[in-house]
Amino acid sequence: MMLKPSIDTLLDKVPSKYSLVILQAKRAHELEAGATPTQEFKSVKSTLQALEEIESGNVVIHPDPSAKREAVRAKIEAERLAKEEEERKIKEQIAKEKEEEGEKI
């Protein structure tokens, strides 16, 4: 029985079989957790779906893991700052409304 995608095809996409296993496992976990698929799948199982994505080149190992971590940190920080700004605007609006109510009385 020939398995698709073949190991030879997959090893052209990643540096080693160990990297392939790690990449497949991480992507399968992401798919199980509800991550958006990058393509339509022939397979039902998330592990095989991950291999299909690797074969098509839609999922790759990040060449610089520290840069990826820094990008994730920057995104989280930007989201935090946006949330703080939104909270500040809401508090200002509430204070303004209370001030206007105080003038009416």
Curated annotation (Swiss-Prot):
It catalyses: RNA(n) + a ribonucleoside 5'-triphosphate = RNA(n+1) + diphosphate. SUPFAM superfamilies: RPB6/omega subunit-like. Keywords: DNA-directed RNA polymerase, Nucleotidyltransferase, Transcription, Transferase. GO terms for cellular component: DNA-directed RNA polymerase complex. The keyword Nucleotidyltransferase applies. Its EC number is 2.7.7.6. Promotes RNA polymerase assembly. Latches the N- and C-terminal regions of the beta' subunit thereby facilitating its interaction with the beta and alpha subunits. Belongs to the RNA polymerase subunit omega family. This is DNA-directed RNA polymerase subunit omega. It comes from Streptococcus pyogenes serotype M5 (strain Manfredo). The lineage of its organism: Bacteria, Bacillati, Bacillota, Bacilli, Lactobacillales.
